[in-house]
Amino acid sequence: MDIAALLSGGVDSSVVVHLLCEQGYKPTLFYIKIGMDGAEYMDCSAEEDIELSTAIARRYGLALEVVDLHREYWDNVAAYAIEKIRKGQTPNPDVMCNKLIKFGCFEQQVGKDFDLTATGHYATTLQLGGKTWLGTAKDPIKDQTDFLAQIDYLQVSKLLFPIGGLMKHEVREIALQAGLPSARRKDSQGICFLGKINYNDFVRRFLGEKEGAVIEFETGKKIGTHRGYWFHTIGQRKGLGLGGGPWFVVKKDIQDNIIYVSHGYDAEQQYGYEFRMKDFNFITDNPWEGSTGEEEVTFKIRHTPEFIKGRLLHDEEGYRIISSEKLQGIAPGQFGVIYDAESRVCFGSGEIG
């Protein structure tokens, strides 16, 4: 069986290679090079990533190829993020990177020549009813199915997640015992295309600055200023520069460039119990095809370890979730990710409208 393995230079993908080789496979290794447009935005950490990936390839006597998808990434993912921010929405570039780049452009250019593509994502695949479904990882804190919930059936049916059945500390221990060069490397943080670039610097480059008012939601009183609504997201608590907190963003007026904040006077105004999703993507199948009732599900609206219980309803306008608990920071542009009631199978996701 011919397997393509995606390397990032981190401990997770390195352990993927180690496990595949222990099982007798000889995967071909690929490092996908992405990044911002413009030399001043190129991330120097990519050089270290490639060095570590090269060391892994040499360690196991495997071929490593660097696949440059910088232009494809810029056209498909970075541009998407900028447009969402411009509209006052909260983008999720990691979701689109998986859908369009790692399992999109890479598959079209390279992966098509292999039987399977292995990655270091914390996820699993399940065989149910003769079909492949996206399953959650053993480690709920590291589970990354929410970042994979926009892929399609052709993509999930070719994916292999060798570390999905392991806890993070087990992965780290395997790397230490095997003496892998990335064994003690810290996990990457933040948006995938920014690398070490400051998020606000990225936004400022493309959207500039424009002073606007910060208004207390409950009283209508102006309590400060900001440099542009596009620097702020619903639910944001840090970086507001306001005294007397904690404050968090509860609303944005895009037309008048106003940020509304609150810190707990009226909890019912700050939270919601339901949200709608548009253009819902079922990864494998719609398990409720033809059903007109409510379905018991679990879901996520951001990358957190917790799965929230709720009810999924379908009407002429699409799908909506009624949560069993209050939800803070329901952000248009993010994705509502739907799972079965046991949080075992990830069915797909839709953009929160």
UniProtKB/Swiss-Prot annotation:
Disulphides: 97-192
Positions that bind ATP: 6-13, 120
Record region (Interaction with target base in tRNA): 92-94
Protein localization: Cytoplasm
Residues at the active site: 97 (nucleophile), 192 (cysteine persulfide intermediate)
Catalytic activity annotation: S-sulfanyl-L-cysteinyl-[protein] + uridine(34) in tRNA + AH2 + ATP = 2-thiouridine(34) in tRNA + L-cysteinyl-[protein] + A + AMP + diphosphate + H(+)
Gene3D superfamilies: Adenine nucleotide alpha hydrolases-like domains (2.30.30.280), HUPs (3.40.50.620), Translation factors (2.40.30.10)
SUPFAM superfamilies the UniProt entry points to: Adenine nucleotide alpha hydrolases-like
One Pfam family in the UniProt entry: tRNA_Me_trans_M
Domain of life: Bacteria
Keyword Metal-binding: no
CDD domains, sorted: MnmA_TRMU-like (cd01998)
Keywords: ATP-binding, Cytoplasm, Disulfide bond, Nucleotide-binding, RNA-binding, Transferase, tRNA processing, tRNA-binding
EC number: 2.8.1.13
Residue numbers spanned by region Interaction with tRNA: 142-144
UniProt KW Zinc-finger keyword: no
Protein name: tRNA-specific 2-thiouridylase MnmA 2
